[in-house]
Regions:
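Hydrophobic positions on the alpha1 helix immediately C-terminal to the Walker A/P-loop
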Residues: 65, 69
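Interdomain "pre-motor" coupling segment immediately N-terminal to P-loop NTPase/helicase cores
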Residues: 1-14
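Pre-Walker A (Motif I) flank of P-loop NTPase domains
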Residues: 48-52, 87-88
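Phosphate-binding/switch region of NTP-binding enzymes
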Residues: 53-54, 59, 63-64, 90, ...
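N-terminal pre-Walker A segment at the start of P-loop NTPase domains
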Residues: 12-41
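Conserved inter-motif catalytic segment of the P-loop NTP-binding fold
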Residues: 36-37, 41-42, 58-60, 78, ...
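Active-site catalytic microenvironments for nucleophilic, acid-base chemistry
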Residues: 72-76
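Short amphipathic alpha-helix starts
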Residues: 45-50, 192
Length: 222
């Protein structure tokens, strides 16, 4: 069941607090749940309802890979031999421009003209640390599902820097607010959230910014 069926956007608007929306987690005893299996959007690559990041230096094809995943999910086509669960995708192109639409069209042509009607794009950043922006994302997801008939399975924020506002990437407090916003998006939509992120000046040191981010991720790709 889609999380939007459980927690309405009206409830979100009226609550005044995101944390109060978290449903009470059930108590589990002993080894209950030991045999639960992880479900995937892309088998063995992107788990369902997960927080994922791709990071690397400029020009390392991070966005190219993220968009390729998006296209395969929107089409339901297997990706590199991995089974794919078809669904809608929201791609937030925070850097704007027409590059994303051109890449999508190239993908369609390469795959025999297959139209990606389940792939929705925003050509402007959104800021998960801002509660009002989270509401906007939820509204977009409802609209996308209504239009396509498929729930949003993946939300891509490209890039973290563009969707971070004026906050300090090195601040654990600011990064914590960003992470909390992404968690709320996951909770209320049931989608996975994928962040496209940069390395710092020293590539060997990994992704740029606070270590709170990698600690919060379910999967990280370099």
């Amino acid at each position: 069941m889609n999380s939007l069926d459980i927690i309405s956007i009206d409830a979100l608007y009226n609550s005044g607090s995101f944390t109060s929306l978290d449903p009470k987690a059930p108590l589990l005893y002993g080894s209950i749940g030991f045999d639960a299996k992880q479900s995937y959007i892309i088998k063995g690559v992107i788990p369902e309802n997960s927080f994922v990041s791709i990071y690397g230096p400029s020009g390392s094809f991070k966005s190219f890979l993220a968009l390729d995943w998006a296209c395969h999910i929107a089409s339901g086509m297997n990706w590199d031999g991995h089974k794919v669960k078809k669904g809608s995708v929201l791609y937030v192109a925070g850097e704007g421009g027409i590059g994303v639409s051109q890449r999508v069209r190239a993908w369609e042509i390469h795959h025999s003209g297959k139209e990606l009607s389940n792939l929705a794009r925003l050509s402007a950043p959104v800021f998960p640390a801002d509660g009002d922006q989270v509401k906007n994302i939820l509204t977009y997801c409802e609209e996308i599902e209504s239009t396509t008939g498929y729930p949003v399975k993946l939300i891509i924020l490209d890039t973290l820097a563009r969707c971070y506002g004026g906050n300090d990437e090195n601040s654990s407090r600011d990064m914590g607010a960003f992470i909390q916003g992404c968690d709320q998006i996951k909770l209320l939509t049931g989608a996975s959230v994928l962040i496209v992120h940069h390395t710092g000046k020293n590539i060997a040191n990994g992704a740029r910014g606070s270590s709170a981010l990698p600690a919060a991720l379910d999967v990280e790709f370099q």
